[in-house]
Amino acid sequence: MRLNTLSPAAGSKSAPKRVGRGIGSGLGKTAGRGHKGQKSRSGGGVRVGFEGGQMPLKIRLPKFGFTSRRALVTAEVRLLELAKVNGDVIDLNTLKDANVLTRNIQFAKIVLSGTIERPVTVKGLKVTKGARAAIEAAGGKIEE
């Protein structure tokens, strides 16, 4: 048996509907679309959320919130990713050099996910309570 010789069991798959192929098929001429109207045309149909000209729900409801610009340049760093960084001092630039963070990131926060075995010094980064405890338990320290 080879992958290129596999085929489904006989009768398990039905043939696709072939529309517009003559009267005898039952789907000739208008091909199941009916007569005239927007939905019978090529490319016909309305966009998602269109309500026939009535003011759509999306516009009837009030706007709310905004996208924080700071959130776009902030990232979370897991404890296990700190192992990729060479050296004992970890700051924003060393994380970027180790390809843990992309170049556009300006703020980072270390979160407790995974473990860290070696002692490291974290400078100028935010750290969660759990991550702080794990870093200090490994013999490291956090400098603001």
Swiss-Prot record:
Recorded superkingdom: Bacteria
GO biological process, one term: translation
GO molecular function annotation: rRNA binding; structural constituent of ribosome
Name of one Pfam family that matches: Ribosomal_L27A
Biased composition (Gly residues): 21-31
Keyword NAD: no
Record-level GO cellular component terms: cytosolic large ribosomal subunit
Keywords linked to the UniProt accession: Ribonucleoprotein, Ribosomal protein, RNA-binding, rRNA-binding
SUPFAM superfamilies documented for this protein: Ribosomal proteins L15p and L18e
UniProt region (Disordered), positions on chain: 1-49
Claim: Transferase is one of the keywords in the record: no
Known function: Binds to the 23S rRNA.
Assembly with partners or alone: Part of the 50S ribosomal subunit.
Family to which this protein belongs: Belongs to the universal ribosomal protein uL15 family.
NCBIfam families (alphabetical): rplO_bact
HAMAP family reported for this sequence: Ribosomal_uL15
Protein name in UniProt: Large ribosomal subunit protein uL15
Source species: Shewanella denitrificans (strain OS217 / ATCC BAA-1090 / DSM 15013)
